[in-house]
Amino acid sequence: MGKLSRIKAALHRVLFPSAVLLASTAGAFGLGRSGSGLLPGRVASAAREAVKDTVIYPTEAYRYGPTGRKSGETIAIDTLAAKLESMVVARQEEDSGGVKKLSPRDSLKQLLDSTLWDKLDSIYIADSTAKAKAAFEAWYNGLSKEERKKYDNEQKAKLLRAMADSLRQVKERKQEIKDSILEATPRILETYAIADTMQYKRLISWTMDQDFGSIKPSVPDTSFNYHFYDHPFQRNDVNATWLGVAGSPVQYYDWFKRKSDEGVEFYNALESWSLSPRTAPFYNSKTPYTELCYYGTLLGAKAKESDNLHLFTTQNISPEFNFSLLFDRFGGGGMLDREQTINKTSSVQANYLGKKYTMHFGYIHNMVSRQENGGMQDISWIRDTTVDARDIPITLKNADSKVKKNSFFLEQQLRVPFTFIEKMKASRDSSYSFNPDSLNRDITTAFIGHSSEITTYTRNYNDVISDEAGRNFYNNAFFYEPGRTADSSRVRKIDNKLYIRLQPWSSEAVVSKLDLGVGDLYRSYFDSTSVRPTLHKENTFYIYAGAEGQIRENFFWDARGKYNLIGYDAGDFNLSANGEIKLYPFRKARKSPLSLGVNFETRLENPNWYTQHYNSNHFKWDNEFSKISTSTLQGTLSVPRWKLDASVGYALLAGNLYYDTQGIIRQNDSPMSVLSASIRKEFVLGPLHLDNKLLLQYSSNQEVLPLPNLSLNLRYFLQFVAQKSDDGLRDILVMQLGANAFYNSAWYSPAWNPALGVFQNQNERLYTNGPYFDVFLNMQWKRACIFVKFQNAGQGWPMNKSDYFSADRYIVTQRGFSGLKIGIYWPFYMEPTGHPAK
């Protein structure tokens, strides 16, 4: 019986839907009414009852009263079918003018369980699709061949457009997602190379260390006190020997600042105006940053006009990658005849500061074009008369020089943290806490780096000399062609370094870095005269090492050493060590330090090729100089809160080189010493500011190394706020009104040698190089720095004889409209405005 029941139930499940379909179809056509037709009455009755298989009980059916379920009959209905039935009937009545009329499909839905509607819909859709397909094929077959082809092409074009639109929409959606992610992601610099406290600054800068890739960032100074000095050398020293025209050769007064960065004899005097791979600043900026700067004598005569221009822009493409462009122009016509100078520097730089990789890349171009006049023939024209400077006779009437430098450089470093050591410790000790942060600086780490530099220096000198003054200037020396000179010199330097830095423990440990590197330096020297060109090549392989560390935030130290193993400069070495103590003694300024520093350096170096062997029309020599020994010891004191900086230095020299009064290179046979002390202190007495710079120096052999014993730069001014913001919290316009004076004790100021491109000694004329002073109005207007200077206002006053010489037989700018200089420095950047005031 059980088996027979299961068979009957199965047949019922199969036959029942078919019977329902037949009954509903017959009912739609008026068949089977009153129990007659295709469907027996028993089956029709079962079909009518089938709509009750899906039920929803009213809410009251689930509630219980005191005596159980509420009284009253609960009716089980198919609410879905009832709802749809009422909607269909209403629509049919509306379409038929109020007469109830159901389509076969709707009448079937009335009879069937709602769970079977999908089967009915699939049959209806299939039937409709078949009819539509048959109608389309009949229409399509009735078309001609040309009409079919046209139709197919139209449909294909529509399909291609639809596909293209679909792909475009997909790409747009993907780009929208990327843009939304980028917009929502904070642009935060994350790098191991700089401290966390500097990563959130709006703008930071640093210089590149080619030896070990270390970075020490700082915030650039954009104040009007810094940009008051429009000549770079005036920011670095009390004063300098120079030729009086912006962009012309410079030699610092302070002997300790004369150390050459490039190491090229004819380029040393031009270094202060341009950049090198070691002095070029790199930047990281949160917003685009641009500097526009102009210093010049707009109202002066065109022949004497000075025009200095500075254009700079930098921007971070990403928080890690920065790109910058620079153009500097210094120059002017000068006071004397034929001393026009044009000094241009262009640079393109990029840097990347990543979590495990840093990179610095750049190109620097410097060109200096200058008319060489050899200075005035007789300085009494300045000391004893008041004639126009253009009427003073000059020494060289037809001479000029041109210097070019092109430098490419690359420095890169890879950080390799030894996280496996920490993981091993954590696996052995469950209580050990391991920090998986990739920027964790307190673990053992290795840094592998490489730096490369390719630099070419060229100098061309030309003159035509036919008078006695010009011949006497060069001691009547014409080795190759009398009366005419065309000398060329070229130095090419290729320096490659590979190093590894090891951080044994933390980046702030007593020994935080241990460094080791190797390098190769290739140099070539070229002399070209109208008769005999020469070329010399040399190569040197060297090793170098270093170490550094700190104790908390109070003591810092570092040491480095370099030794040339093989090659032209074999045996040369350089050792240096630095120490600094930082104390914070000020109760009201906890973060303002008092810094004490010490530096020691000793080096032994071979004289370069041009000092040993040189051939030109006016000078030639072949020397066998011994190595040069230099040892220095310096101490520094810095107290920013007191606006005080001081330093002392001692140097012991042996075998040092100098150019004598004839312009011939010489080597000092006996040891000598240099003692130096400098101080800068600004006194503030209400609105009165007394900014004093003083330099004391002593040279044990003035014939070899002449130095001024005393040099002064005094800037005294009144400072006041001319305008404040509406809320009174910010200074809108700050003004300074005062004078800037220069003076030094009498000394034999060096002379300029145009043929060699160096300063040489002279022992005929003593100079005090002053006093001369500029009267100025200096302003800080919001971000802009603006000044107006009336240069050399005294022009010899209060001395009996004028002495505003900048070098032997060269003068600085004279007063008048030619000395009225206007300067403006304007940085452009965006900065956060903060939350709106409530």
Language-model-detected regions and their locations in the chain:
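Terminal non-domain segments
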Residues: 4, 17-18, 343, 389-393, ...
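Exposed, low-structure sequence patches enriched in small/polar residues
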Residues: 33, 285-287, 292, 395-838
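Hydrophobic alpha-helical elements and their junctions with loops/disorder across both membrane
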Residues: 24-26, 129, 173, 699
